[in-house]
Amino acid sequence: MANFSFVSGAKFRPFSYQEMLQPLQAYTQEYNTIQEGMGELGTKADVFERMANEQTDPQAYAMYKQYSNDLAAQAESLAKQGLTPASRQGLIDMKRRYSSEIVPIEQAYKRRQELVDEQRKLQAQDSTLLFDRPASTLSLDELISNPALSPQSYSGALLSKQVGTAAQNLAKEVRENPRKWRTILGNQYYETIMQKGFRPEEIMQAVQNNPEASPILQGIVEDAVGSSGIRNWNDENILNRAYDYARQGLWNAVGETQYQTLSNKAYDYAMQERLAAAKKGKTEGTPSAVFRSVPKTKVDGDKKTTELNDELQFIQQLRANPSMINEEVERVNPGYPTQYGVNVGGGIYKVKPHAERLQQIIKKYDMKDGNMDQLEQKLQADIRSSAVRDFIYKPNITQSDLISQVIKENARTLGAATESTGLYELDDNRKGDPIKLKNISDYFTGDNDISYDPEVGLIINATKDGKTKSAVIDPELIDDADRSVAGYMNNINVLLENGYDVEAQRYINTMMNYIYGKFNTLAKRQSNTDSKLE
């Protein structure tokens, strides 16, 4: 038996704590990574639970819900079974599915918001713009299946212009009325009229959609609305608004009218007495059970009327004596003094004052073709319309708190939904900047009244501590579904612009009756409610 010995120089070195901990740390780190990944996916996905509506977006909601449930199952498996190859693959699959299932929901939501902002911007540029549907009503399902989807739109102003152009061309071709006498302006003037085109009464019938209106005028409107494609939108309210805009263009069918004006002295004297009494006693205009007309006392109003009459008289003189246009007068340019006390640059020069004034008037009324007939008609129309514009119209509503309550609630609702309260500052008797939602309480003091100024629109007045603040009201704040008030105001503006003051006054009467009836009905309801409570 061999005799030998084995000597080992190895030394025992146990694993350090750090070395034994490394596998556990690696496991824990990967476990946490997967867990955090799933948590992050869950957090992102949960956002879309509030965006996708089960009723309006069933497909998007179902897709989100399935993803959310599968993600929860993966997290539960990780918690129970620990880190496995399946859990690693599960995270990869859920990331892939997030891109294909959740990201489209996110993109659809962003696209819808972009369309909402775009519509708001377009309407700020053109308040007459009509949409086949509000962008806010688009479902996420629609935008997921068709990301390029966009609501159709058409401008009401364009409709009116198209009808106006067609009506104007028609007026020159199809009608010619003989010269005749007629009384207008409530006997204020007698005028000789030669009319080429449609009479205002015929236009009014077509604008009001009277069955007896001219079929030719109705046909123009139908053609314009039909070519716009709005009928295919299947929205009766939008279609009615389109017809309203289109019919306004019919006023261009009123033919060219030449006037020879003879003042009715008896009427002038009686009217002057009434106006003098009204201004002296600050009395009101024609009394009514539902509204009162308050004469304006602004100097600017009197100045404007005087300017209009002076300009009309000048145009009539110029037409009677065209040679006036070439009359010259000499003017002196005093020059300017130098540092040595000597005037330089002075001298006599000639000008044509009548030609200069005519150019100023043409520019003022944008009569680029210089048509003297149209210019004279425009001045006469403005003078006639000033009789209506010189008054402010106030409904006889005693419960001012009801006015304030309705308008304030509607302004808040509109402001929360669209960031526009429908109220605007009254700046120098003009519609100014929009009033923000946070500032509307300044215009609702409990002591409120509303009025209508044909030059501005609807106005709400609020009085507190003896001080009054006023704001212009968007008709939408008190309007009905048919936009009756907006329609009345639009018709009044068109009629006054064309000098049809009698017809405009009728519309004002109708609108004030509507406003009075609306708030008076609320007052009666409130009174009945209070009686029952007692």
From Swiss-Prot:
Keyword line: Viral genome ejection through host cell envelope, Viral penetration into host cytoplasm, Virion, Virus entry into host cell
Assembly mode: Homododecamer. Localizes inside the capsid.
Protein name listed in UniProt: Cargo protein 2
Cell compartments where the protein resides: Virion
Top-level taxon of origin: Viruses
Biological process annotations from GO: symbiont entry into host cell
GO CC term, one of those recorded: virion component
